[in-house]
A protein has these predicted regions:
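C-terminal structural segments of small proteins and small subunits
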Residues: 62-97
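Conserved acetyl-CoA-binding loop-helix of GNAT-fold acetyltransferases
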Residues: 48-60
Length: 99
């Protein structure tokens, strides 16, 4: 599996060169240091192998490396942030989950 990082998207490509999923995170208009975790999608043939979790982790690393603030829209990513208190500092204070 290869992962291709582009501005505002990380894609997963299988060993045959076929796209099998991605996470998209467009910028928030007027805030160059903010992105919206819009969606994670994994094609049916890629499901059941932890790919959504891997894409989410790579997104979190991307956000930390670039000092981004994250707004949560995708239910999957929102659940990941809720389950990982260590991600909370990527969120605005009013968006953080009470632990």
């Amino acid at each position: 599996m290869q992962f291709v990082t582009e501005p505002h998207r990380i894609s997963a490509i299988d060993d045959n060169g076929k796209w099998v999923g991605d996470i998209s995170f467009p910028p928030v208009a007027g805030y160059p240091d903010r992105v919206v975790a819009e969606r994670v999608f994994v094609a049916p043939e890629g499901r059941g192998h932890g790919l959504a979790a891997e894409l989410t982790k790579r997104f979190v690393d991307y956000a930390y490396e670039r000092h981004l603030t994250v707004k949560l829209m995708c239910p999957y990513v929102k659940a990941a942030f809720r389950d990982h208190p260590e991600y909370q500092d990527l969120l605005l204070p009013e968006d953080r989950f009470n632990q």
